[in-house]
Curated annotation (Swiss-Prot):
The PHD-type zinc finger mediates the binding to H3K4me3. Component of the HBO1 complex, which specifically mediates acetylation of histone H3 at 'Lys-14' (H3K14ac) and, to a lower extent, acetylation of histone H4. Component of the MOZ/MORF complex which has a histone H3 acetyltransferase activity. Through chromatin acetylation it may regulate DNA replication and may function as a transcriptional coactivator. Inhibits cell growth, induces a delay in S-phase progression and enhances Fas-induced apoptosis in an INCA1-dependent manner. The modification Omega-N-methylarginine is found at R126. Keywords: Acetylation, Activator, Chromatin regulator, Chromosome, Metal-binding, Methylation, Nucleus, Phosphoprotein, Transcription, Transcription regulation, Zinc, Zinc-finger. This is Inhibitor of growth protein 5. One of its GO terms (biological process) is negative regulation of fibroblast proliferation.
Length: 240
């Protein structure tokens, strides 16, 4: 019964995942198409400029080159948005994997506790073990349930009930995020952490870090124009 409730709970948690993934992949395809359209526009603008450059005035040349540069900037913006979206998608899937790992660990621990309790009762310690164990579990379940109700949104109610189900439902989302991450996952930013939330890329092509979390560089929205990370800005000042 506990296994069925555990499975139902996890399936509920990933119910919207396919739709979210489909949406993100669709957005990435749209960004790809926009980039291709803009590249085709750049080819046309470049061909026109080359064929007419001798007849253009200096101001007209600057104007045509500015259009080409703006188109390239737009291409880079689309590419940055696509990378950002890909990182968010990776984070979304990784969060569910880590949650599954956490739930499996708790499920195995619960089974182990029940098996140990059963062995103890069969060896003659039934009354003392059972009474003390139930008292401790009631206290633990009560605290867990209050934490869940106060700190997390209301979840769909499940039919039936068990100590294991109560334990799973009382797990705070932060417990999942605190699980160890994949050691092979790349790290970014000044904090040397994995990708999460909104991130921004440094426009210095030689930047050793490349990507930064908004909060770590005191950003709340994506700035207009080029952006350089604090480390690259400092290096640039030293060279002056």
């Amino acid at each position: 019964m506990a296994t069925a409730m555990y499975l139902e709970h996890y399936l509920d948690s990933i119910e919207n995942l396919p739709c979210e993934l489909q949406r993100n992949f669709q957005l990435m395809r749209e960004l790809d198409q926009r980039t291709e359209d803009k590249k085709a526009e750049i080819d046309i603008l470049a061909a026109e400029y080359i064929s007419t450059v001798k007849t253009l005035s200096p101001d007209q040349r600057v104007e045509r080159l500015q259009k080409i540069q703006n188109a390239y900037s737009k291409c880079k913006e689309y590419s940055d948005d696509k990378v950002q979206l890909a990182m968010q998608t990776y984070e979304m899937v990784d969060k569910h994997i880590r949650r599954l790992d956490a739930d499996l660990a708790r499920f195995e621990a619960d089974l182990k506790d029940k098996m140990e309790g059963s062995d103890f009762e069969s060896s003659g310690g039934r009354g003392l073990k059972k009474g003390r164990g139930q008292k401790e579990k009631r206290g633990s379940r009560g605290r867990g349930r209050r934490t869940s109700e106060e700190d997390t949104p209301k979840k769909k109610k499940h039919k039936g009930g068990s100590e294991f189900t109560d334990t799973i439902l009382s797990v705070h989302p932060s417990d999942v995020l605190d699980m160890p991450v994949d050691p092979n996952e790349p790290t970014y930013c000044l904090c040397h952490q994995v990708s999460y939330g909104e991130m921004i890329g440094c426009d210095n092509p030689d930047c050793p870090i490349e990507w930064f979390h908004f909060a770590c560089v005191d950003l709340t929205t994506k700035p207009k124009g080029k952006w350089f990370c604090p480390r690259c800005v400092q290096e640039k000042r030293k060279k002056k």
